[in-house]
């Protein structure tokens, strides 16, 4: 846990309240929290409605009588968020449909082709499942077509944990239907026992398609999945 790591890393604990420029709040909250928690071991803060703020906490091993520790950490986070902001502004404008062809250059797994190959399989599986769920096949196939394109983005390269999530943001920003955006966001769910499952039918169709393709594919090449997580 971040709490135990942050407090355990210092002997004489001093908690300092810092802040960053409010303009960075336009960046998706997942990027902000990951930058603060995973990269810097900072503690983000939230208002009474659960909305992230521009203030964060750090744990220091000495008193900051001159305010230099506070200033130094604020400079560090602003530099990191400036990079994230640059990637966000660049990536969100990249046409997702045109990015599909780039998946031909990204291997999914040896023996299972590229991510482009996987996307074609997901389109077929998703179409079959959409017929069973009596939902729009067009939406499911569109979701499947662009669901892996965020893997080519700078942001997912920097924050691999955000694959799918960033794709959902990109799709929403580019005007795709909200069902399509949510399906992309939730395609990997559930990740483990402590995460929720997709509830919307389009999200269910894409998530199940992705897992079926992975399971059948790995058994097909005699690579039996062994994990505590869903494939």
Locate the predicted segments by residue.
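Active-site microenvironment for binding and transforming phosphate-containing groups
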Residues: 147
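Alpha-helical phosphate/pyrophosphate-handling elements in metalloenzyme active cores
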Residues: 42-44, 49-51, 55-63, 71, ...
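Negatively charged sequence features
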Residues: 22-28, 34-35, 69, 73-87, ...
